[in-house]
UniProtKB/Swiss-Prot annotation:
Name listed for the protein in its UniProt record: Uncharacterized ATP-binding protein PYRAB09480
Any Pfam family the entry gives: MJ1010-like_2nd
Positions annotated to bind ATP: 28-35
Record-level Gene Ontology MF annotations: ATP binding; ATP hydrolysis activity
Amino acid sequence: MFFNRERELEKLLRLVSTEPNLITFVYGPINSGKTALMMEFIKKLPDDHIAFYINLRRTPITSYSDFVDVLFSVEFRNKVKTLKEAVSLVLSAGKETFGFPVPTELLARITKEKKPKNAFAYIVTLMEEVRKAGKRPILILDELQVIGDLKVDGSLIYELFNFFIHLTKESHLSHVFVVTSDSLFIERVYSEAMLQGRAEYFLVDDFKRETALRFLKNNGLSDDEAELVWNYFGGKPVYLAETIKHRDELKEWCERMLKLRTSQILDELYALEKELFEKVVKLFFAFEKQESVPYRSLSEEILWAVKRNILFAEPVDRVLRPQGRLELLAIKRILDIIE
């Protein structure tokens, strides 16, 4: 759902009007509207820009060949025989292309050799040709964390980081946007020495109260109904959009969603051994009277809660908070149940 993200859009558009220098990591709580924002960003790009958009969640990625399949989109298979044809295909695509067109024989070689640097070298060549033709390439990778542990003669993620550094800080060839909802991944990135001075961080958060209420009222909810929804879901875009479908049973639906989330967390909690269970409960008590708490390091209980999308770890400010208001309410109910 895209609504009232003009400030974020303006920042992104201003960023791509300058020379590429830094990798931009776009992050935030789960379902905060990051992908919707990037899709709208692509639509608003000036005509002399073209975005190569790759969603790594589109298909399961468990091997290098899976990664190549997503990188070099199947929609271009058997359509391209030369680099010139690949460039022409990109230039005719408008502002966006899903993946990179690649000559068939070269793709077979890239897949067989299992050397990421060969795939990246081709992408650089393609982008250089696109640039010569008067277009400014932009690379957007959505959900990069899904390949975080994939090994191809070493960690693929580090090969990618080096590639991104080359595209931005070294060659100034392309802006690079990496989108993720995984706060453990962004914490890892934020602490990565090789990215110091080579990356910036762009937070896409849930809507503020004023924005959420305006969206709900614009879609026909009364003041009281909008307040009810805010009290259950805060500014989480996905729930605000779903609310419109359930207006005839609004209170019941909101309560049902809270019961479901509470039950899901309890199922996970009750499966823990006693020591970790007690640590998690103690962590939950930190949110009994406040919505965010500082953290020094990612302890066992924090890792458990973040991996299960109960809590969101914000590495820049080093604070923990529930993934959304629904999780905050569920935590409070759980504390009432287990006391």
